[in-house]
Amino acid sequence: MKDIIGISFDTNDLDDDNAFLMMVLKEIDADLEWKVDCFTDYEDYLNSEIEGYLSIKELEKVLNESKKAIFIRIMGKNKAGKPQSIETKNDFFASDYEVCVLCCDSAYYEIYSKQEETVLKIKSMVAGRCSHVEMITKQTVCRTEFMV
């Protein structure tokens, strides 16, 4: 694993009802299934962990219904296909998951990946569109807890 483990950025107050989040997820991998924990302002998903894995289309439906992700943690499907308990950065990097997306208020993002190429791809996508874009390295980790 390389030194770059993630990226953080702000979406400059885009009021897009999760459209930018969907663009980010599709950029990571449009065919990946996602494990979702979320706090949203939509009652059906308030303080919930959605069972199983969602396809990008199913996730888009959830995000369209929720309108605004107050806090959402989305993890790409792990190799074993079984949900694993992820509470810390170390749990994530010891797991089979490849990517973890943390989003607050549909505006602030932290994306962690075991593949540096994924982080660099997201950096190219957000450059010039977002503010406070910062690469996260093993030495400069912003967060140790990955809990929702």
Residue ranges and their predicted role:
Residues 103-148:
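Acidic, proline/glycine-rich low-complexity IDRs
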Residues 31, 96-99, 106-109:
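Short, surface-exposed beta-edge/turn micro-motifs
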Residues 3-59:
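N-terminal interaction modules that seed assembly of large macromolecular complexes
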Residues 13-19, 31-33, 82-83, 110, ...:
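Short, surface-exposed beta-strand/loop "edge" segments at domain boundaries and coil↔beta transitions
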Residues 10-14, 39, 77-80, 104-106, ...:
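Generic structural motif
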Residues 40-101:
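Surface-exposed, low-hydrophobicity interaction/linker segments
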Residues 1-2, 27-33, 127-136:
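Structural alpha-beta junctions
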